[in-house]
């Protein structure tokens, strides 16, 4: 059990028969009445985001999520195969389970698979990934107004806004949390 006063971003808790990850929280002390903690939680099974308010000092169960380092091998129909680097055990995850993460996954990429009591919850990506540009319009000389961007399609099918000097074939660093261009690799 953990007090809601000890909430941290990224903490996983078990509340209302669900597994939740704390995305954001705020301690509130109104002029009248008792203090409370307003939180924004993401359901690890469904991916839905919900706002929930707890009384200050309320206790909730901390969920112990195990992260296993795995390598993304390949896609087989709607199943995606991952291999444990230590035991060489392979698991399959459905497309619906990792829909958002698919935009950043390439073969042989190292990821963390989140599990809770043997149940696979999803894939945790690194903060940034390197992806190659497969399609983009050429930059126009003289079009140098500040922060001019253009769309670029990456090798995974993800479309991001990039500066005009980026060309096809270049490798870019992409932030997986926001899905945005960071820099050239």
UniProtKB/Swiss-Prot annotation:
Primary gene name: efp
GO CC, any one term: cytoplasm
SUPFAM superfamilies xrefs: Nucleic acid-binding proteins (SSF50249), Translation proteins SH3-like domain (SSF50104)
Compartmental location: Cytoplasm
Pfam families per record: EFP (PF01132), EFP_N (PF08207), Elong-fact-P_C (PF09285)
Molecular function GO terms recorded: translation elongation factor activity
Record-linked CDD domains: S1_EF-P_repeat_1 (cd04470), S1_EF-P_repeat_2 (cd05794)
Gene3D superfamilies linked: 2.30.30.30, Nucleic acid-binding proteins (2.40.50.140)
Functional description taken from the UniProt entry: Involved in peptide bond synthesis. Stimulates efficient translation and peptide-bond synthesis on native or reconstituted 70S ribosomes in vitro. Probably functions indirectly by altering the affinity of the ribosome for aminoacyl-tRNA, thus increasing their reactivity as acceptors for peptidyl transferase.
Protein name: Elongation factor P
HAMAP family documented for this protein: EF_P
Record-stated family: Belongs to the elongation factor P family.
Source domain of life: Bacteria
């Amino acid at each position: 059990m953990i007090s809601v006063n000890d909430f941290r971003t990224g903490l996983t808790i078990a509340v209302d028969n669900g597994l939740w990850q704390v995305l954001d929280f705020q301690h509130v002390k109104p002029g009248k009445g008792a203090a409370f903690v307003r939180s924004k939680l993401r359901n690890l099974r469904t991916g839905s985001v919900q706002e929930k308010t707890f009384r200050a000092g309320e206790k909730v169960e901390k969920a112990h999520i195990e992260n296993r380092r795995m390598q993304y091998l390949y896609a087989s129909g709607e199943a995606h195969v991952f291999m444990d680097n230590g035991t060489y055990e392979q698991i399959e995850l459905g497309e619906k389970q990792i829909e958002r993460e698919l935009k950043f996954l390439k073969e042989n990429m190292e990821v963390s698979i989140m599990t809770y009591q043997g149940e696979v919850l999803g894939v945790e990506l690194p903060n940034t990934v390197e992806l190659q540009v497969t399609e983009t319009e050429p930059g126009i000389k003289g079009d140098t107004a500040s922060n001019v961007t253009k769309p670029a399609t990456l090798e995974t099918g993800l479309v991001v806004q990039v500066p005009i000097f980026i060309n096809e074939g270049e490798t870019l660093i992409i932030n997986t949390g926001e899905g945005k261009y960071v820099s050239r690799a």
